[in-house]
Amino acid sequence: MDDALAFYSETFERFELRSTNKPDPNGATFTADFAIYGHEFIGMNWPGGPAFNDSISLSLNVDGQEEVDRLWEAITARGKAGRCGWCVDEFGVSWQVSPIQMREHLENPDREKAEYANQALMKMSKIVIDELYA
């Protein structure tokens, strides 16, 4: 838990650690209440608890390629890359790193351009905005 909190505080510009519960002052954090980009989470250090899986992912809707690149590199450095903007961090948490500009391409009223963007997206790991243009 402590390593994850340190990683998230370094990675996400809008990370806020709100409270922690350390039953043993010299031990590991048992629970933590934190927010990432204003979304609240409670994490628990539960040895032997259920493992993370891809059925739940946290979506990061970011502005611009530079922010996509920064987050993608940080998350996948010790994690793993998936398809269509999905990746998993070193702690097993699944993320979707999506530029807000992607939606305008996928929802383009010109159906040919929208389909081009969709087909391009299906071939990507990290999303590259410029490659969504027809």
Language-model features and meaning:
Residues 1-2, 11, 36-40, 51-52, ...:
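Vicinal oxygen chelate
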Residues 1-38:
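Core segments of cupin and vicinal oxygen chelate
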Residues 45-48:
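Short beta-strand/turn micro-motifs at beta-sheet edges
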Residues 112-134:
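C-terminal cap/linker of serine protease catalytic domains
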